[in-house]
Amino acid sequence: VSSDYAKIKSVTLRPVVKTRLPSSLIHVGPENGDSLATPVMPLIGENKGLMMDFDILEDEIRPLQWRIIHCDRNWRKSNLVESEYMTVVDCDFLIDGDFADFSYNTTVPYVHYDFYFPFHGGSSTPEIRFLMSGNYVVQVYEQVYEGEDEYAYESDIVLIQKRFVVTEQLVEIQAEIKRPNLVQYMDDSQQISMKIVPHGFDLSTFDKDLYVVYRQNGRWDNTICGIQPNHVSGDGSLVFNDNRNALFKGGNEFRNFHFKSLRIATTPVDYIEKNDGKYFVYLHPDRDWHAAYTSTTDLNGNFLTSEDTHNNADYCADYADVKFTLPYHRNYYDTLDLYVFGGFNDWKLNDENKMTYNSRLQQIGNIF
């Protein structure tokens, strides 16, 4: 992360941090507990805020802190000062032992942290509210001292940063997903058509002031941005229709598995073993899905933390190594790379989730 937070992404920046729930195993969502909801909150009205929770794989509590950063439409740190978008400025929001729980009866020790924002405050904690809508990032960091003796200086080490959005209902948005009109995209893509009804809101300079962002199932990695309307209707509404740039590939259904219990192997888990005090979950060899499409219910690439034995998965669920296998014949000229990816790693294709080829004509993947 550069000094000006250029193009702030949702990431886990330190390898010691392992987080859970949607997006990079970090959960930022409504405080009502809907773990699959998109982290969006209204500026006005019943503002119940958001919750962030994560795990750090160690057996002691760190004195962490968090802060809010306002971003422009391109997710770069804006030029606004804190007092322009928040009611509280220059305040260190601590994540101490009151916001942390040690894991219970797990093979992998971890500390589970969670906190809510904004909050109403208390006798010693000021209230925090947002003053404007827009793009925001919540950062979790720790302060460390570098150097020695009188030459020591304080430095912020950012562990996690996640995006969220504060909204205002200034216009009416009418949108639908339909089959593309263009023949070459009919069988593999989905088209978004949209109409923005101003209801008195000034959209006369939409070419400069309006910036449209389409997201597929809450993802940030494949957003479609900057789409312009096809025409303006008589009532001033902006119509976005039949635009080949507003297409998402339909893809296929996501593969599903769960190991809520590490004692019983459930479909599609082949078997579970425990070696050196650690669990290993082996999935049945998968198959290529180049076949007739069948609809299945899934989480659109996201995941939930759950555990059958105890009442609270936040600190009772265990970690395991999961082994993925895809039978695949690789030719000498084949340069295809295969990955296991989804919400658990923020939809990133990297070396950690890249599958490797072995002599048994299989692609092998391992995710912890």
Predicted ranges, named:
Residues S2-T12, I157-D187:
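Low-complexity, Pro/Ser/Thr- and charge-rich linker/hinge segments at domain boundaries
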Residues R14-D72, Q184-P198, N311-F324:
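Contiguous beta-strand segments within globular domains
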Residues E58-D92, D202-P229, L336-N345:
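Extended low-complexity, serine/threonine- and proline-enriched intrinsically disordered segments
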Residues V89-F119, W220-S233, K323-F368:
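Aromatic-rich carbohydrate-binding modules that target alpha-glucans
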Residues P109-Q143:
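Ligand-binding face of N-terminal immunoglobulin V-set domains in extracellular IgSF glycoproteins
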Residues G147-E172, T297-T305, T325-R330:
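Extended, polar beta-sheet/loop recognition surfaces of beta-rich domains
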Residues L203-T294:
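Long, internal scaffold/assembly segments composed of regular secondary structure
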Residues Y282-L336:
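Basic K/R-rich, polyanion-interacting modules in nucleoproteins and related proteins
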